């Protein structure tokens, strides 16, 4: 069953096409990877999905329903949650309060929200930090809190943006385990990730984009061997080295 469908997504900023003709489908229970060099349009696609930016053209469907132009909070209530590459929790509030605030997307009373928040905190391994202020957490735990907040909305589709960025190897392994366990519990996932070890380990299929356009879709093995993908990443590396 197809959970999510993006049809010919286009987004212009002035005369610049940040996303141009991107189409893909995600099946129920799938972890779908989205890769590309820096500035290729990956996060812009997430911003289009939850209507942080309006589409220039194209359409987006959750199951059989178009969500194009829908308010962001309504998209969340329908079942799409996301994390952000630069995490910004409610810094002066506790972990529990942060997650409780997210839980109100799904329930109506403080008692229900706190119950859902604690269940989600325990699942994500943050129970011992529930009374800590978010601003006191190191980056690895703030990244985990970001996932926990999104998960407390009980999404059908979870969008993860650079979850592994800035993590130690141990934290990276823990993040992979958490994402896989979330997926095993029935949540479909689209993940943006720049660390190839992570994306190749957890994704069932991957879409590679460059300059806002799709260049390849396939299994991790197929993507790793694709000449256009290799060229896109080698080109980025050469530019970074000034060659």
Predicted features along the sequence, with ranges:
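Glycine-rich phosphate-binding loops of nucleotide-dependent enzymes
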Residues: 2-243
């Amino acid at each position: 069953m197809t959970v999510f469908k993006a049809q010919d997504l286009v987004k212009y900023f002035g005369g610049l096409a940040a996303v141009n003709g991107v189409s893909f489908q995600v099946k129920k229970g799938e972890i779908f990877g989205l890769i590309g060099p820096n500035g290729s349009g990956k996060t812009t696609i997430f911003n289009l999905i939850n209507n942080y930016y309006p589409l220039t053209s194209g359409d987006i469907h959750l199951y059989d329903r178009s969500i194009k132009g829908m308010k962001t909070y309504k998209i969340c209530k329908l079942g799409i949650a996301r994390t952000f590459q630069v995490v910004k929790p409610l810094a002066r509030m506790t972990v529990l309060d942060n997650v409780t605030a997210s839980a109100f997307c799904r329930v109506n009373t403080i008692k229900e929200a706190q119950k859902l928040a604690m269940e989600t905190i325990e699942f994500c391994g943050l129970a011992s930090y529930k009374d800590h202020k978010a601003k006191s957490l190191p980056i690895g735990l703030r990244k985990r809190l970001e996932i926990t907040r999104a998960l407390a909305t009980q999404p059908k589709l979870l969008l993860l943006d650079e979850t592994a960025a800035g993590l130690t190897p141990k934290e990276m392994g823990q993040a992979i385990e958490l994402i896989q366990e979330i997926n095993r519990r029935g949540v479909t996932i689209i993940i943006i990730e720049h660390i190839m070890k992570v994306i190749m380990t957890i994704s069932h299929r991957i879409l590679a984009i460059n300059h806002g356009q799709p260049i390849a879709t396939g299994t991790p093995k197929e993507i790793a061997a694709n000449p256009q993908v290799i060229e896109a990443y080698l080109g980025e590396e050469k530019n970074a080295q000034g060659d």
